């Protein structure tokens, strides 16, 4: 019963972090040395699970309504924001939330099937495919280049990749570094673009029709999320990007469902990987790994399911009130507020970790993002900021 109270506390904290762009569960994890003595190990883990699961559900709100993503929602933010500008913001939230919940369920079923029934050897499989990963990514970059529709698109691909190598491979990266990169590339340029908008359209508060193809997309997205266990250095947003290119999904609703699934499946698999192979692939999962706690699989799954159920209820209700609020305020001033807020997050977050360096990174990311927006380039091409350094990481061995 006590664990459930701490799980709910984590859900409350995840709701808060999810609402504000630039605030990440890793910021809470960084305070572990302060929180852990008061919570105790057995209570702290449910708190972290509730925090991270809820965060990614609620984070669809700033992604959809403002177009401001984090490192996981970078690919899905733009199509969701487009629906908001067209008066269908709530529909975007419902689709993403529904896909996320399906992703959680499918991830748990896939994990139990592979690990408990088939006794799948994850470590052996990873060792067998590791050597091929950089070549798969190189082929993927070549595919992007040859299918590019303009010189600007190719330029964005290479600028993003070179920028990623300089910042993430050749230099030391911190938690705030990714925040500066993704907020600068994907968030601020869209917020600057939003400065032209004074009011958003009246929003339809209706649930979209359920389609069976949502289940198929969600399942394949969850399977793709499973591969994150084998790909250190590759984020959920990269997998989102690669999956979107492979599936060539043209149905916007189906695309948002699949993106919701892969975002949550990434995190669920990251958490369960700590139990199955002793390795965490996300900031929160690594924090749990470092605690060296003996985690019961049933407790973990129960915590994940409870968190997801409560989180989607919060998401569907809270988003209605926020949409009504946004309709009443000047959208230009709201966008300006979040430009200032996101910039302050980067400045404060990097105050003790090379402030000037991170400001330069942030401004460079904004420049590349503005170039992509103004040239009407597919913003997902900027995900090469992670793919280029990941290739070098694997080639280095």
From Swiss-Prot:
Stated name of the protein: Uncharacterized protein MJ1079
Membrane spanning stretches: 2-24, 44-66, 92-114, 124-143, 150-169, 173-195, 255-277, 297-319, 331-350, 354-373
PANTHER family: INTEGRAL MEMBRANE PROTEIN
Keyword Transmembrane helix among UniProt keywords: yes
Keywords (A to Z) from UniProt: Cell membrane, Membrane, Transmembrane, Transmembrane helix
GO CC terms, sorted: plasma membrane
Pfam families: TctA
Chief location category: membrane
Organism in which the protein naturally occurs: Methanocaldococcus jannaschii (strain ATCC 43067 / DSM 2661 / JAL-1 / JCM 10045 / NBRC 100440) (Methanococcus jannaschii)
Membrane topology classification: Multi-pass membrane protein
Keyword Glycoprotein: no
Subcellular location as annotated: Cell membrane
